[in-house]
Amino acid sequence: MYKRQILYDETPLHKKNFIELSESGQFDSTIFHRVIENFMIQGGDINLINDEDVIDYTIPAEFNNSLFHKKGEIAAARMGDNVNPKKESSGCQFYIVQGKVYTEDELTLDINALYGGVRRLLEEEEYADTRQKFIEAQNDPQETQKLAISLSSVIEDKYGIKIRKDLSADIVSAYTSVGGVPHLDGGYTVFGRIVEGLEVIDKIAAVKTGPGDKPVEDIPMTFKVKKINKDKITKDYGYTYPE
């Protein structure tokens, strides 16, 4: 299965590291060792195939608001915040985003704020009829959410609670069309993108897995580095390099 990817200039440390590991052949024969459908496919663990810590360093986080977790993006895996508060990236492990397509409401609504406002509203006597509607819909999560969303403007005006998240038009457009994993934004460094062979992600994500979300049959990978003129990349794939 063939994929082509580009690496972002906005994340120079990750780009340099990824190219060096690819050119040296260290990524070759590594596997996708963690696969979760509608989420992501993770691989590149050089230490796993060597049974020792060949890669024992981390890379400082390189967050950029213009780079987010839409489908096909490549991001660095890392240890959790409890042991890695600076969110530094693994020296070799990465994941490719699959995710899912979101509605605009799913994407932009702060559900906790919304339902907190709904609870306050339903305590008021003037909303007794609305409270009854929620009681009647209590066994229908979709109808309950629909009712809650219909009250979002009332809650914002009445209590000054901010219900909608401030997201750029580009982010909303991406997550409501190609999809992705928005809750990872700002927590993991996105440093590249699959630009050809996007369907391969879906094929890998759909394989049978066992304990630890590891595919039952190994899915190995190999890498080749090819330098392409920046103007050609912009023309063919729509990525504009920063000045």
Kindly give the residue locations of the regions a language model identified.
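Cyclophilin-like peptidyl-prolyl cis-trans isomerases
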Residues: 3-243
